[in-house]
């Protein structure tokens, strides 16, 4: 089983990304999802209503307090959820773990996630990639989402591309408009090639 951690600020598109990925990959792979919310099961409920996955393949973890603690310093609640999911479905090939909405410094504990995808969005401005932080600089894949909003918020995608290249060096990044399913195929290809080590 490959565990893929997905984190990023509130509203960047993490839940929508997971919903799109499960829709694209469900027929070919055995999938499951763990979501993290501070005080509610909101993301888990959204996934249950909108995902192609049955609700028993989705676990919502209520982290309380700081969401980044539950994915890094004290990942015990999430590790228990991983264990529970493996007991329910021993055949799981990909487990997506969504962090609670957090800032640019959120990262996953290596024992919780094998790979990390960090999602930011254009609406936060074109300066976000150059601000750096562990998510932008060290994640295995950076997704710059909501590219359709660039003209409305005055964000320059060329500047974002330049800064992402500079901050990430050789690490990959992708531009997406998840709501319109733009760029999702490229994310699926990245997962197949780098996380599942498939020859595409």
From Swiss-Prot:
Domain of life, per lineage = Bacteria
Q: Does the keyword GTP-binding apply?
A: yes
**Cellular location of this protein?**
Cytoplasm
Which GO molecular-function terms appear in the entry? GTP binding; GTPase activity; nickel cation binding
SUPFAM superfamilies to which the protein is assigned, alphabetical: P-loop containing nucleoside triphosphate hydrolases (SSF52540)
Gene3D superfamilies from the xrefs? P-loop containing nucleotide triphosphate hydrolases
Q: What is this protein called?
A: Urease accessory protein UreG
- Species for this entry: Helicobacter hepaticus (strain ATCC 51449 / 3B1)
Q: Which gene encodes it?
A: ureG
């Amino acid at each position: 089983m490959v565990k893929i951690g997905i984190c990023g600020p509130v509203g960047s598109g993490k839940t929508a990304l997971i919903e799109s990925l499960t829709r694209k990959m469900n027929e070919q792979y055995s999938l499951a999802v763990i979501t993290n919310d501070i005080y509610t099961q909101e993301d888990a409920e959204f996934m249950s209503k909108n995902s192609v996955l049955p609700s028993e393949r989705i676990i919502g973890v209520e982290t309380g307090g700081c969401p980044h603690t539950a994915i890094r310093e004290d990942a015990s609640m999430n590790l228990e959820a991983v264990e529970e999911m493996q007991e329910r479905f021993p055949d799981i090939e990909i487990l997506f773990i969504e962090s609670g909405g957090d800032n640019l410094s959120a990262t996953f504990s290596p024992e919780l996630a094998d790979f990390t995808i960090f999602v930011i969005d254009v609406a936060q401005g074109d300066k976000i990639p150059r601000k750096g932080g562990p998510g932008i600089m060290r994640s295995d894949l950076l997704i710059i989402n909501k590219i359709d909003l660039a003209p409305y918020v005055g964000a320059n995608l060329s500047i974002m591309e330049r800064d992402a290249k500079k901050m990430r060096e050789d690490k990959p990044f992708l531009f997406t408009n998840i709501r319109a399913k733009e760029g999702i195929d490229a994310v699926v290809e990245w997962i197949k090639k780098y996380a599942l080590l498939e020859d595409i």
